[in-house]
């Protein structure tokens, strides 16, 4: 499903939690009503679909590289993500993604998303624009260098940086 982005932001309630679960390949196995409502897709479309069905083209790939690196090491991760809806509009989230276990074996991933704070968005939006520009001109390695330089300058890991807002 190819979605054409529109410059229209959607927001969801401050106390609302958007939840999805995926299998190890990133295919959606569960989505709560809040998630389905904001993306304007129902279970027939979402269940079994790759989670990147909602990936907005403005998202720098390096963020997902960090996400998968943490998850594959069995660690939870927090990330600010701009997602796309079925109608092309977008919404921002602060996502917390954790591995799901059965008998000490990772069987999938659980993502809970909240509204990001305005303070975080003041930093994240321009940062992601710079990362995306670097990616377009020099590939993912250029955006990775930019992000790593920022983290080194601040003396923090990615997760510490994200949780500092």
Enumerate the language-model features and the residues they cover:
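Juxtadomain coupling helices with adjacent low-complexity linkers
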Residues: 107-110, 114-165
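Sensory/regulatory domains in signal-transduction proteins
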Residues: 2-131
């Amino acid at each position: 499903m190819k979605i054409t982005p529109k410059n229209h932001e959607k927001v969801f309630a401050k106390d609302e939690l958007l939840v999805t679960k995926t299998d190890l390949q990133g295919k959606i196995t569960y989505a709560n009503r809040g998630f389905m409502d904001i993306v304007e897709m129902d279970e027939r479309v979402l269940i079994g679909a790759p989670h990147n069905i909602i990936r907005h083209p403005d998202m720098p790939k390096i963020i997902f590289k960090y996400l998968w690196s943490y998850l594959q090491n069995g660690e939870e991760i927090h990330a600010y993500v701009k997602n796309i809806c079925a109608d092309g509009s977008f919404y921002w989230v602060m996502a917390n993604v954790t591995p799901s276990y059965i008998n000490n074996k990772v069987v999938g991933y659980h993502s809970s998303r909240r509204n990001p704070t305005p303070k975080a968005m003041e930093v994240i939006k321009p940062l992601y624009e710079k990362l995306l520009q670097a990616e377009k001109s020099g590939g993912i390695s250029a955006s990775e260098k930019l992000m790593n330089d920022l983290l080194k300058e601040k003396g923090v890991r990615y997760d510490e940086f994200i949780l500092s807002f």
